[in-house]
A protein has these predicted regions:
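Conserved active-site "lid/cap" helical segment
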Residues: 1-74
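Conserved catalytic cysteine-centered active-site region
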Residues: 35-37, 41-53, 81-107
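Short glycine-rich or small-residue beta-strand-to-loop segments that form or flank ligand, phosphate
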Residues: 75-80
Length: 107
């Protein structure tokens, strides 16, 4: 396993932002209470996006940031607790959406 490296990263977030003030209109809480206990001010909610679409967007950004061609990728590795399907895996869907060689490892 020599020569394996992460040369770039990318990120993608859903468009829908849910603030603590938004939550306070739904449940009995407020921004100060949530922020003091969690440090969280905003969170992101998927409406149109999927785990796969966000992973593809982030992967595309990582490839662009690294300045490498997608054909240089030797594996697709995805870690998530919010996959879109039980099967196929998010990694396999990303592999397909990016047009990567079907022979590379995807998990």
């Amino acid at each position: 396993m020599n020569g394996i490296q992460i040369v770039s990263t990318g990120r993608a977030l859903p468009k829908q932002v849910v603030s603590n003030d938004d939550l306070s209109r739904i449940v009995d809480t407020n921004d100060e209470w949530i922020t003091a206990r969690t440090g969280i001010k905003n969170r992101y909610k998927c409406e149109e996006e999927t785990c796969v679409s966000l992973a593809v967007e982030a992967s595309s950004k990582a490839l662009e940031n690294a300045g490498i061609d997608k054909n240089e990728i030797g594996a697709v590795i995805v870690a998530t607790s919010t996959g879109d399907y039980v099967f196929p895996s998010v990694a396999c869907m990303v592999q397909k959406e990016l047009g990567l060689d079907q022979e590379i490892t995807a998990f």
